[in-house]
Amino acid sequence: MNRNARFRQKLQDPALMHAMSAHNPLAAKLAAEAGFDAIWGSGFELSASYAVPDANILSPSQHLDMMRAIAATVEAPVIADIDTGFGNAINVSYMVPQYEAAGVSAVVMEDKTFPKDTSLRAAGRQELVRVAEFQGKIEAACGARRDADFCVIARTEALIAGAGEREALARAREYEAAGADAILIHSRQSTPDEILSFVSAWQGRVPLVLVPTAYPQLRESDIQALGKVGLVIYGNHAIRAAAGAMRDVFARIRREGGIHEVDAVLPTVKEIIALQGDAQMRELERRYLK
């Protein structure tokens, strides 16, 4: 069973699937080592790693290159965050086969205008496209995939945009009808109330996807108990962990006047070399260097 088939099967299983964000192959490798079922190829994290806003400033090829490198590094299925699809349905038709060829098992596409503004930015510009327009994008994505197990996940930002639960449910139903394999419902409220209400009201056949960044008090056991959620995505925790660790270590080095204290709490150089695939290279040297 290939990665696409494994991802589709896991998405439909009663047991909750867990995906961790990544912005490079090293982060993906660490997430896989920690036991996450899938890797979320985060556009937010990639943008943050370049120190630019998550607003379609980076090119699609930069994100695609990241996806290709991650998929080549880990065995876990990779989910690509393709924002709004990089344009209209025609752009989607051209981009989906490229992501599939890069080794990605699913794409997540949101129903906002292009260029987008990041969902969790306070007072951000959150404009939704027409339902019919987004249905066309979903149909284009489904029509462009070559493997029937490759998943197209539709993300509605109706709650983010303040359009309310009724609009979010209506959009989700239309997106399911257009062929979406799952619905990602997003919220930036600090409590899970509107998400729980949406999940309770959802009567569709396809599973839901949650990203609990804004409401971290909702635990995996709580999500599992809802019964309609197939996947939870931790959408930005790799870059936040990395930024926090770097900030703390850099500050300590300046404060302590060197690395004599902080070095003991860092991963060793030997550990980093191992993460770089040193054992594989040594085996290749043994076999082929004569």
Residues of each region from the PLM?
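Extended, intrinsically disordered, low-complexity segments
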Residues: 143, 238-290
